[in-house]
A protein has these predicted regions:
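Beta-rich, blade/repeat-based domains predominating
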Residues: 1-5, 22-23, 41-58, 82-99, ...
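Beta-propeller domains
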Residues: 10-34
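Recurrent small/Gly-Pro-centered beta-turn motifs in extracellular repeat architectures
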Residues: 11-13, 61, 102, 142-144, ...
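Short glycine/acidic-enriched loop and turn motifs that connect beta-strands
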Residues: 14-18, 64, 105-106, 145-149, ...
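WD40 beta-propeller blade core
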Residues: 27, 66-67, 107-109, 160, ...
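Short loop/turn segments that connect beta-strands within beta-propeller blades
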Residues: 29-34, 69-74, 111-115, 163-167, ...
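A short beta-strand motif characteristic of beta-propeller blades
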Residues: 34-41, 74-80, 115-121, 167-174, ...
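Asp-box/WD-like beta-propeller blade repeats and closely related beta-sheet repeat scaffolds
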Residues: 64-97, 101-107
Length: 247
């Protein structure tokens, strides 16, 4: 979501999640839900998570991070990671460093100073998916492990905190074994996460309290938003909803 320009950007895989078919694209909607450009940026493979920094949109696209100029939709450049298996979400911190999750590869990548490389590989990541940054740490919504052929897991994913100075990985209180986590945002004094497999939207408060906000069907994916209004995609239904999570 781009409050500055009053747009919502939507990634459309248009194929299998790991298929390099060049048919993926980005759509642009107004913040009141009106579709302005269905194929705003084309030629992608299977685009997923996105982040905005300094007038540019960065898009995770299987094994590359694509940089798009927001004012024009111009494709500026790619940052490639040939060893990545399924780049998923993207987040930017205040100094311009970007972090990208590789869910299938069980790794986190970092773009810093024009260099895009694997930053952390650790089994404790539990197949990282959604990302956000808060209070000097990278917060990770993990999918769980091991990943079966149908993407179910024996062990549910947790909400993790990675200190950006020490790289220490810990579980967040109340965020242990939540589910097959996908979307993640910081809202007020807690985190809102989505469970893709169960279709559950949950809030994990800083005090460690879990609250189920809504329960829908399978396919609840990445989350965007501003304030207490979230934009929630339903990937199996081809639908986007605005959801209020005001306390």
């Amino acid at each position: 979501m781009d409050p500055e320009r009053s747009y919502v950007y939507v990634s459309n895989i248009n194929g299998d999640p790991d298929e390099k078919n060049g048919q993926g694209y980005l759509s642009r909607l107004t913040t009141d839900g009106r579709l302005t450009e269905q194929q705003w940026v084309t030629g992608l493979n299977a685009p997923k998570g996105m982040a905005i920094h300094d007038g540019y949109l960065y898009v995770a696209d299987i094994d590359r991070l694509v940089k798009i100029e927001l004012n024009t939709g111009r494709w500026v450049r790619d940052f490639t990671a040939p060893e990545a298996l399924l780049l998923n979400d993207v987040v930017a911190n205040g100094n311009g460093t970007l972090y990208v999750s590789d869910m299938v590869g069980n790794a986190l990548y970092r773009l810093q100073g024009g260099e895009f490389v694997a930053w952390i590989r650790d089994d404790r990541l539990m197949h990282p998916n959604g990302l956000t940054i808060h209070d000097g740490a990278l917060i990770v919504a993990a999918w769980g492990t091991p990943i079966n052929a149908d993407f179910s897991t024996a062990q549910p994913g947790s909400l993790l905190r990675i200190d950006l100075t020490t790289y220490t990985i810990t579980e967040i209180d109340g965020g242990e074994s939540l589910g097959n986590l996908d979307g993640l945002v910081r809202v007020d004094s807690g985190y809102v996460v989505s469970d893709w497999m169960s279709g559950t939207l949950m809030r994990i408060g800083d005090e460690g309290r879990r609250t189920v906000l809504a329960h829908w069907t399978m396919g609840l994916a990445d989350i965007g938003g501003a304030g207490s209004t979230l934009v929630v995609p339903f990937t199996m239904d081809g639908e986007i909803r605005a959801v209020s999570v005001a306390p």
